[in-house]
From Swiss-Prot:
Organism of provenance: Trichodesmium erythraeum (strain IMS101)
Designated name of the protein: Small ribosomal subunit protein bS18
InterPro entries documented for this protein: Ribosomal_bS18, Ribosomal_bS18_CS, Ribosomal_bS18_sf
Lineage: Bacteria, Bacillati, Cyanobacteriota, Cyanophyceae, Oscillatoriophycideae
Cellular component aspect of the GO annotation: cytosolic small ribosomal subunit
HAMAP family xref list: Ribosomal_bS18
Transmembrane segments: none
Family from the record: Belongs to the bacterial ribosomal protein bS18 family.
Gene3D superfamilies: Ribosomal protein S18
Length: 72
């Protein structure tokens, strides 16, 4: 029987590190209001999502990313 479900492919390769200093990468996974996108939307693996969340929170702590984006 054929497999009807497409295998999900993570947008970030599993071996690639997620670094808190890579602000351009982190901004892709934050909403316009500044919230971290959930895993079902990002398509990351659970380990990558945990690493991404840690990196975003660390980047916010050292003021590389804002906690909340102001609405215009």
């Amino acid at each position: 029987m054929a497999n009807y479900y497409r295998k999900r492919v993570s947008p970030i390769k599993p071996g690639d590190p997620i670094d808190y200093k890579d602000v351009e990468l982190l901004k892709k996974y934050i909403t316009e209001r500044g919230k971290i996108m959930p895993r079902r939307i990002t398509g990351l693996t659970s380990k990558q999502q945990r690493d991404l969340t840690k990196s975003i929170k660390r980047a916010r702590l050292v003021a590389l990313l804002p906690y909340v984006n102001k609405e215009s």
